[in-house]
């Protein structure tokens, strides 16, 4: 097995500076009615980098980035990289316990923020806007400190089997390699990208860096959980031509607003895969090309692409395609030798995109990144086979990692979080097919007393520990967990009983008499969205198993049926039909406030 030809890759600041010189006064970023050109963005990032150096940041310093979506986020991110710092993104929408865990694991001496302080006592928090103002008069030329493509650019935290997030160290070369890419997926300077993915996830590298390093325009969505009308309006209003969407959200968008795709030239389906009927409609609506894409954090995101055809849909098998330049895909058997076409083995990745490893986890790094015949590789944990044309088709997972709404989730991390709640004795999580064709998590548990736990209390505890995409849709209490003939847990024997919500004493919940017509309508719409029985007006949406995509769908249904525009994040915050009904009344009276 031979190594790939060497790919000359610069650092991210060097690649961005080249793109900025070529783009000049073209718009780089748009956010609402505000915009910034490439020339302005580069100069602002240079001034910010120099301010950071005066604050004591040195090449190799790890700095947290704890910000909401705004133009200043990108100035800060690029400025940090120009100062030679390692960027550690913190998602403000994640539970504070998750963010504090990242601060602790990454050992962050400094965190830049535009959100309220008080994240953690182990990091110094500085306001980004104050630092920008303090550096406004500094030299706006590049400090030229970041020149080694092998140096660490980002540490991105992913789901881990140990029950705590693990940091993936990503080198500049891993992301900057896309600067020289213009192959199967063509990026034009007149393209307009939509920045949808959270910047703390590897999927955002396509939205941010594939665009900026080619001089394209990036439209930043104010929310990572947009309503469907808002998403469609943004695509049309700003003339978005390049869309990178998870499959579940694509399903909802083509159902509700097929016209949004009318002028989109390129669509990349990433994360989870859309249903074949939805995909066929997207392919018909898009005047350009729809691609199936594969990527993972350990290979700095975008890895392989495949232009989808009607024949793919007829066969029911869509390859992830061929690797990007500088990337190798290898399907290997147990003896670590290449499998013949059609033979199933584990997919491995080699090349310029490989991460440096896991932060502080040398043994896990060695196991995940083996050297095979002198070539460093990544074991993806995906069963795969190659086609006669050399493309790779995924056929399953080798471990307990699953994809939920486009995010990779270790089932063990969810189980450990439930065990730590103190409400269950033992928890086991399975991924099952949902009514919308996506995957969802179901938690099975036992208790020391044999009595069912409070489902709402358990889910509330999990919500404080885990991101929303890792929350189980349903919880089932069992007298005991099934075991096989060897006395080991038999996951496949776990079956869902008929869905009945239970109180802590094990009795079925009694639904209150509903007299609020708006709340009643909300529960009925939620039942349609989730494919389950209507819940009570005071029951938690979270406890009923509603996920972020279903909340977006509920917001769209409320718009269609009741003529009100409810933000998905407000639905998450209010969390029951009774409170949401009050909010809807306030909206109808012209008030935007979310009731406490």
Swiss-Prot record:
Q: Which SUPFAM superfamilies match?
A: Acetyl-CoA synthetase-like, ACP-like
Record flagged with keyword Nucleotide-binding: yes
Q: Does the keyword Hydrolase apply?
A: no
Q: Which residues carry this modification: O-(pantetheine 4'-phosphoryl)serine?
A: 548
Its annotated pathway reads: Antibiotic biosynthesis
Q: For the Carrier domain, which residue ranges apply?
A: 512-588
User: What keywords is this UniProt entry annotated with?
Assistant: Antibiotic biosynthesis, ATP-binding, Nucleotide-binding, Phosphopantetheine, Phosphoprotein, Transferase
The record's annotation in NCBIfam families points to:
AA-adenyl-dom
Domain comment?
A: Contains a A-domain and a T-domain. The A-domain is responsible for selection and activation of a substrate, which is then covalently tethered to the T-domain.
Q: What is this protein called?
A: 3-hydroxy-4-methylanthranilate adenylyltransferase
Q: Species name for this entry? A: Streptosporangium sibiricum
Q: Its encoding gene is what? A: sibE
